[in-house]
């Protein structure tokens, strides 16, 4: 028996959680079809579902057998959905890869999808290998997510995950030395940088 998660982050999370809990765990495979899932949620084994009380309230750490990513599927995404994945890509650049940050400022993600996806997956792989269960270094991957999850909840989940993470990152870096550069990069990709709630 095996499950296949063909879709975005929600599909991957739900499928991974079902695979982790059905018969105490069966094989599953991730086949991400969104940029966000390709660079982030399909990799690393975090699976969770939302409850009315908040995001990712019930879940498990459960690794897929493999992740298969075909960048051609990203061409079918509406601009808004594609933009959401850009927030997660930028997160990796902000986490300490100055060369990647410079690349994202100078180039366009859409024109360099394979290279960008491979770079983000490698960064996440390295972090997860060092801290699979989110006890230390992996917490860096939550950049923008604490505030972002609150924004999502306050909006009744009308604000997308990517937009909420962008708002969260902007809030966190606003007073940092390179905060203006980070906010400028988010804005380059059409991401919001101001929280609509006070």
Residue ranges and their predicted role:
Residues 1-25:
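Anion-binding (especially nucleotide phosphate/pyrophosphate-binding) glycine-rich loop
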Residues 2, 27, 35, 119, ...:
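Residue-level recognition of specific faces of alpha-helices
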Residues 6-8, 32, 160-162:
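Active-site nucleophile and cofactor-binding loops and adjacent substrate-binding regions
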Residues 8, 31, 69, 143-144:
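Single, functionally critical "micro-switch" positions that shape active/binding sites
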Residues 9-14, 46-47, 61, 146, ...:
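Gly/Ser/Thr-rich beta-alpha loop segments that engage phosphate groups in nucleotides
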Residues 11, 96, 178:
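Short phosphate-engaging motifs
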Residues 16-107:
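A glycine/threonine-rich phosphate-anchoring loop and its flanking beta-alpha core
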Residues 103, 107-197:
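Active-site segments that bind and position negatively charged phosphate/pyrophosphate groups
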């Amino acid at each position: 028996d095996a499950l296949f998660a063909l879709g975005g982050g929600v599909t991957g999370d739900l499928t991974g959680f079902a695979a982790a809990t059905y018969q105490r765990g069966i094989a599953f495979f991730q086949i991400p079809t969104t940029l966000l899932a390709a660079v982030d949620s399909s990799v690393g084994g975090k699976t969770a579902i939302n409850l009315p009380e908040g995001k990712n309230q019930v879940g498990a750490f459960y690794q897929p057998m493999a992740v298969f990513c075909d960048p051609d599927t990203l061409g079918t995404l509406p601009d808004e959905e594609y933009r959401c994945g850009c927030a997660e890509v930028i997160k990796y650049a902000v986490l300490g890869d100055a060369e990647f940050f410079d690349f994202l400022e100078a180039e366009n993600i859409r024109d360099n999808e394979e290279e960008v996806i491979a770079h983000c997956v490698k960064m996440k792989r390295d972090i997860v290998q060092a801290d699979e269960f989110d006890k230390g270094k992996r917490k860096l991957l939550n950049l923008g997510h604490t505030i972002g999850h609150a924004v999502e909840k306050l909006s009744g989940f009308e604000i997308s995950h990517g937009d909420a993470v962008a708002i969260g990152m902007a809030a966190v870096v606003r007073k940092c030395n390179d905060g203006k550069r980070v906010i400028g990069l988010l804005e380059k990709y059409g991401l919001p940088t101001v929280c609509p709630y006070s």
